[in-house]
Each structure stands twice: as C-alpha cells, then as structure tokens.
Amino acid sequence: MAGIRKKTAFFCQECGYESAKWTGQCPSCKAWNSMVEEPIRISSSKSSAAAARGLSGSRTPFSLGGDNRSLQPVPLSQVKDLAETRFSTGFSELDRVLGGGAVAGSLVLFGGDPGIGKSTILLQTSCHMAAAGISVLYISGEESLRQIKLRAMRIGSAPDTLKFLCETGLGTISDIILRSKPQVVVIDSIQTMYSDDIQSAPGSVSQVRETTAVLLRLAKETGITFFIVGHVTKEGTVAGPRVLEHMVDTVLYFEGDRYASYRILRGVKNRFGSTNEIGVFEMRREGLVEVPNPSEYMLSGRPLGSSGSAVTCSMEGTRPMLTEVQALVVRTNFG
C-alpha cells in the first residue's frame, strides 16, 4: 500500500514496553525474556488523517475529545455534574464486587483459568440484564452461534433483547456497535480480536493493546458498558501486556478449582468501588448459582466436636465470614 512503511519492534509481554532492539531484560518492568518481535506499521500523514476520521469511515472524528482543533482546557467548575449511573447485573454477588452494580461507560475485564466459568457467568449476566430491559450485544470470537445457543439452552432462555454476534474484526465490531448502540457489550475474548491496522497475529501484545484502547474510547464516548474476557497465563495473571490491566476500569478474577463446584469472584482493581469484596458462586448443571451465605460453604463437611479445629470470623469487605482453622498437634518424646 502506498504511503505505508513496515518495520518491526520489540514489545514486552508483561508491561507493553516498546524497544527498537531486543534486550534480555525489559528496561521498564525488569522482566527477563519477555521481549517479543512484532511488525508495526507507520502510516504517512495522508493515511493518518484518513484514520482520524473514524473507524467507520465517516468524517466525524472518533476520539475522546472530538476534533482536536476545537479542544480547550476547562476548569472543573465548568464541567456538568452528572450522577453516577449504575445498573444491576442480575447477580447480587457480582453487583457487590463491582461496588453496587455496573457503571455506565465502564470497561470491566474478567480473568480466570480456562474452564472456570468466565463465559458462563457473562452469558447468564447478559440474560439477566436483557430480561430487565437492558439492550445487550454478546460478541464471541471463540464459539459459533450454534455453540452459544446450546449453552444458553442449558442455563435458560435468552430474551430477544439479547443479540449475538460472532466476529473478531475490530473495524466491523466498532461499526456494528455504533449503529446498534447497545447499552452493554460483552467481548469473549479480547485475545481473539484483531485490528487491520496492526500487522500481527490476534492475541499479540500490539493487537491486545490496540483493541483495548479502541474499546476504551468507545466506552467513554458512547457510555456503553463493556465486559471483556481475558485469558490468564500460567502465573495466574491476564495474558498480554500488563498495560491492559492499567487501561480498564475494573479487573475481576474468577478463581477456584475447575473440578470443584464453588467459584470465588475477586476484584483486584476497581475505579468505582472497593477491591475488598468477594462474590461466591456454585457451578451447577443449570449454570452458576449465587451463594448468599459463604460461611456455610467454608464450614461444610466440618465434623462437630473434633480436636485441633477452631472457627474464626474474618471480614471480607463488608461481609463477615466464618472460616475453619486447623492445627495438628502430636505428643513428642521431649516431654
């Protein structure tokens, strides 16, 4: 393509640091063997001006501030006061972790091990919100519509206000979102999305960073709430550059043994609430079910009157929880 030059650069998989040459240790986060080479594209001024007109090809600038020529710094006293708009997700446990419900225009990242139930909880949440009259668009890059329908039939029916789309192209997804204007968008998953402007494979550092940046601009400009699924690495962190967690508003981790029935939803970052709250769910055949009394789960199977066992109370956010503490004490020959 005329006016476009291609070259490669090295990116840190942990923090997203960019370097012109390879280094064994990232100069930013000090991680070893985290630099990977990826092609990047440098556009000419003409093509850059065309890109500034928006993802959909319109002449309306697509940026957080609109046309840069009309931007002016203003004091906070001239900014209109708007009440924080929250709405329920249909799960009281999820609302608790989010700080009282989802915030309009926020970007929420769901992380967790494969098979832990990330897609299931978001599909159930989408059904609950759609049943409450909220328009929801569920975008999947990992499953076909037939597979999603089979899973939806297992957990219950999906209302007609819940729309589904199987697509991974960021440009197409952005156009559909701007045309349909849903209130909530679910992306499953961010590692499958790609932008044509980045000449690298989906899931790479450049692709994850660019697609998340575009979704963030969409959320802030339109007021649409985004829930995006992120895969985790063997260390238990979200795959991709660490900058991904810094860009989003909320980071939630779905924890638990995939072979056990209980799951714990924990918030590690929340710009609109506390990160001390947790939500407890139980995985059943019909999907995830909330556990309103986690103490019962913590003490399940504890024999009454057993030695070496004590019950203590701890606070997880605003919720007191009873947990069992065990100690093994045996007689020794030292008196």
Put a short name on every predicted segment:
Residues 83-84, 111, 159-167, 195-209:
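Flexible beta-alpha connector loops of hexameric P-loop NTPases
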Residues 6-8, 22:
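Short metal-coordination and nucleic-acid-contact micro-motifs, chiefly zinc-binding Cys/His arrays
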Residues 27-31, 35, 41-76, 80, ...:
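Conserved P-loop NTPase
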Residues 91, 152-179:
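Short glycine-rich substrate-engagement loop in P-loop NTPases that contacts/grips substrate
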